[in-house]
Amino acid sequence: MNEQYSALRSNVSMLGKVLGETIKDALGEHILDRVETIRKLSKSSRAGNEANRQELLTTLQNLSNDELLPVARAFSQFLNLANTAEQYHSISPKGEAASNPEVIARTLRKLKNQPDLNDATIKKAVESLSLELVLTAHPTEITRRTLIHKMGEINNCLKQLDNTDIADYERHQVMRRLRQLIAQSWHTDEIRKQRPSPVDEAKWGFAVVENSLWQGVPNYLRELNEQLEENLGYKLPVDFVPVRFTSWMGGDRDGNPNVTADITRHVLLLSRWKATDLFLKDIHVLVSELSMVDATPELLALVGEEGASEPYRYLMKKLRARLMATQSWLEARLKGEKLPKPAGLLTQNEQLWEPLYACYQSLQACGMGIIANGELLDTLRRVKCFGVPLVRIDIRQESTRHTEALGEITRYLGIGDYESWSEADKQAFLIRELNSKRPLLPRNWEPSNDTREVLETCKVIAEAPKGSIAAYVISMAKTPSDVLAVHLLLKEAGIGFAMPVAPLFETLDDLNNADDVMTQLLNIDWYRGLIQGKQMVMIGYSDSAKDAGVMAASWAQYQAQDALIKTCEKAGIELTLFHGRGGSIGRGGAPAHAALLSQPPGSLKGGLRVTEQGEMIRFKYGLPEVTVSSLSLYTSAILEANLLPPPEPKDSWRHIMDELSVISCETYRGYVRENKDFVPYFRSATPEQELGKLPLGSRPAKRRPTGGVESLRAIPWIFAWTQNRLMLPAWLGAGTALQKVVEDGKQSELEAMCRDWPFFSTRLGMLEMVFSKADLWLADYYDQRLVAKTLWPLGKELRDLLEEDIKVVLAIANDSHLMADLPWIAESIQLRNVYTDPLNVLQAELLYRSRLTEEQGKSPDPRVEQALMVTIAGVAAGMRNTG
């Protein structure tokens, strides 16, 4: 174990040293000395030296306005470098073995050792594997794209330095490159000046595909194939690609007025353009490589006399010409030019697949399998995974927008006000219209801008090439009419196929009613006919946790999934559960393997569809090797969950969870909703108001411009509490509930649940992770520096609660310290704390100065404002997640 850490620590130390030299060259010895003094004080403070802790506070409080930014940047950049080293460590030969693709081999061996599983059953489970990762542009990716690129280059340098055979002169060159990259990062502004537009966000998503997934996916499939061949004697079929990617970037308009129908249309074109660009690079390589002459009669017939001398090249050149013509047409469309479609325009995956697969079959038949299974196989697999659209997009819109649009239509037609009708009347009207042959929308009618936007979006879906839009997600779905309304609006737009429409249940009440809503829908004959035996339902993690606290939300999510699985099974419907998880614990984030195995039995039968949000995309897919690792973990978890499902919880365990849920929800809401001091405390103890100044995502922080905590989106809500290290949304209520159940004499039952029920042990594990990142003295310091004395008792009460919660969780888990079973993560948090602590102290000081300036009616000092933004980015890097 220690060997693993020493490799990581020596890389972190080496990168820190280079950063120190860079700072000295840029700003002089005195700034580096100041940074080093603060670092040493922080280390000593962490080790428990109270005098040094006080000195740390005094030193940071006394920094001049000119010193603020360099000090903030030094610690922030160090944390980015530490994260880069850690990401490399997770895939390096000296790193944590669990992250390597070996995880698939371990799972296959485990499955083979089960007496009631045979190879045929395992093979069948592999063939039904389905993994869809939905990339979302949540404003949590705080790091600029230009810096992410440099971090990737630094990773490559670490890889080269890890090579034991590296010659001295090569090592010298790599170190020089490393110094250049760290200097470039230091001299780059880490805070972007403008908010990204939805198109910028989409381009960020395409960059992830190009820089990592494009190579990572074929590498993962090669790895999976090798492990299956070795363990089961089974080869993956060429056309079997169990993973695909969808994006919300450019499609998610929930609460984001910047995502319009025109934006979605533009992003769809841009996505196709990027696909042609990437496939052109692949075909260019194949034109060069496939110089072979031997071919099957079928291939020779396909190329004719003209291509007989180099049949493979001939086909590849023809495909290249089609790709180039398609790209030119898409470029013109993106510029707003209306051109007729050229002959041979590529719109369907089959058009790419057929010539490539013809070459593949011919090479195999002519004894050149080794060539067929090289670059050509990788390209074929990319066609299956990415294809002509590159990434499909989801459309997401809030349910009330559809209700308002239909209300406007019915009022204009003089048939009443749809918005005020009962649920039964709405359903009767919708089913009647869905069965009707005549259009509902009147001609020459001028709708309001909001309604026009909803209708235009439906038109974009109807016009988009088939397969480029994956699903229509309805956020804040509450009733069957919410789902039927979308189907009617799509029908009116002229959609010619059954678009998957997924209701998103995201508050406590909506999760509790989810099964009832879906049962009603499945009892409608028209609806059953439309969905053809398939239904997608999205489970919201972030908003339910914000509404009721993590304990109540996670139990409601579990029960909703459990009920939906059973209802759909009974009705003969294939259910796909779509998990809207965030990166942070308060938004449903958890280590993938543990999270998947803790779900109700049968929840992954229809495959896994899950959001990958903001900064988690970079941590899990930022490099091809990390992509292989992440996809391997998902694959092994899905196989294990489907073949060795977790046990059904005992009735007594369910009763305890009901109890925990009620107590934790009451506690959570008692503070967040009912305590009159809570909102003023939240606003002053965290940088919530200042977060709005950060140009993070294209989406506003609030659903409505006014209003309290309830109108805040889940992300800024979590982000703010992560910054001041109280981490409140991720634990409030949970420990109080556990303590009450322990006091009722049920500790042994809780211990059994922790031992034998993955759902419960994962909940406790997530709490331990949060507790490891929370910090009582820092949260206290924010109070001392920023909060009115009248609110101090509330802060103390919350910190005391946190302390009690830690004790009760350790008692149930039978551990003496946090994260005892995940020492690697505990070590990683400790490593970063030394650098995050000064940023937290500095942030509290900067918030104090910034607010004082505002109170005095003076204009803000740009040095203070800029340094504040840097500390926010730095703490986010230290915590490894933002919201």
From Swiss-Prot:
Record's keyword annotation contains Magnesium: yes
One GO biological process term: oxaloacetate metabolic process
EC top class, as a word: lyase
Family under the similarity heading: Belongs to the PEPCase type 1 family.
Cofactor(s) needed: Mg(2+)
Quaternary structure note: Homotetramer.
Domain of life according to the entry: Bacteria
The entry's keywords: Allosteric enzyme, Carbon dioxide fixation, Lyase, Magnesium
The protein's Enzyme Commission number: 4.1.1.31
Activity regulation, per record: The enzyme has distinct binding sites for each of the allosteric effectors such as acetyl-CoA, fructose 1,6-bisphosphate, guanosine 3'-diphosphate 5'-diphosphate, long chain fatty acids, and L-aspartate.
Encoding gene, per UniProt annotation: ppc
Catalysed transformations (reactions): oxaloacetate + phosphate = phosphoenolpyruvate + hydrogencarbonate
GO MF annotations, alphabetized: magnesium ion binding; phosphoenolpyruvate carboxylase activity
Keyword Metal-binding among UniProt keywords: no
Active-site residues annotated for this sequence: H138, K546
InterPro entries reported for this sequence: PEP_COase (IPR021135), PEP_COase_bac/pln-type (IPR022805), PEP_COase_Lys_AS (IPR018129), PEPCASE_His_AS (IPR033129), Pyrv/PenolPyrv_kinase-like_dom (IPR015813)
Function of the molecule: Forms oxaloacetate, a four-carbon dicarboxylic acid source for the tricarboxylic acid cycle.
A Pfam family assignment: PEPcase
Designated name of the protein: Phosphoenolpyruvate carboxylase
Taxonomic lineage from the root: Bacteria, Pseudomonadati, Pseudomonadota, Gammaproteobacteria, Enterobacterales
GO (cellular component) term, any one: cytosol
NCBIfam families tied to this protein: PRK00009.1
Organism: Salmonella typhimurium (strain LT2 / SGSC1412 / ATCC 700720)
UniProt cross-references to PANTHER family, sorted A to Z: PHOSPHOENOLPYRUVATE CARBOXYLASE
